[in-house]
């Protein structure tokens, strides 16, 4: 059985349900885990830090789909992505769609938008601009093409003195794929995007937070 030295867990659709309510059983289970638990989310830094504090896990957080990393609650955000490239791509999309931006002033590495247009058509419009358009299941994110949760996980792992291959990761959407690629063991919850399940070493029987509990049980982290 794979024995991780740390875990990275997505938030929306993994620890929460479709209404973004945290699963209390998952929270209780994560508090019992004796190895570092890192939240890896598409959300902004202040949200991720607050969630980590509320849940009771590590202060280390991966935010904005890997575009921002923070190692201490009161520390500084380390920005890994170029937001300006993303803004330029948004300007192109605005010529074709009604684009509704989300949390624009708080995002440091990417641009987040309401899921109100065809993502595949939009991807063609911004092709070659050095960005990628990702669907988190809750919003669209235009990200620097050099940014991913996977690269951020490798960055974090190096700082922690371990390999990303010693991480187990739990997620639900396509923005978790790169994280699954670099981790030692990837677990998709039952409600996960079918594309993510193709990269998973395990798919839990239950969705979202209940699936997280099952994942931790499978890894032998709940005693």
UniProtKB/Swiss-Prot annotation:
**GO molecular function annotations of the record:** magnesium ion binding; phosphoglycolate phosphatase activity
Q: What is this protein called?
A: Phosphoglycolate phosphatase
Q: Which organism is it from?
A: Archaeoglobus fulgidus (strain ATCC 49558 / DSM 4304 / JCM 9628 / NBRC 100126 / VC-16)
The entry's family comment says: Belongs to the archaeal SPP-like hydrolase family.
**Residues given in the record as substrate binding sites:** 149
What top-tier enzyme class does this entry carry? Answer: hydrolase
Enumerate the cofactors the protein uses: Mg(2+)
Q: Which NCBIfam families has this protein been placed in?
A: HAD-SF-IIB, Pglycolate_arch, PRK01158.1, SPP-subfamily
- Lineage, top-rank taxon, reads Archaea
Q: Which InterPro entries does the annotation name?
A: HAD-like_sf (IPR036412), HAD-SF_hydro_IIB (IPR006379), HAD_sf (IPR023214), PGPase (IPR006382)
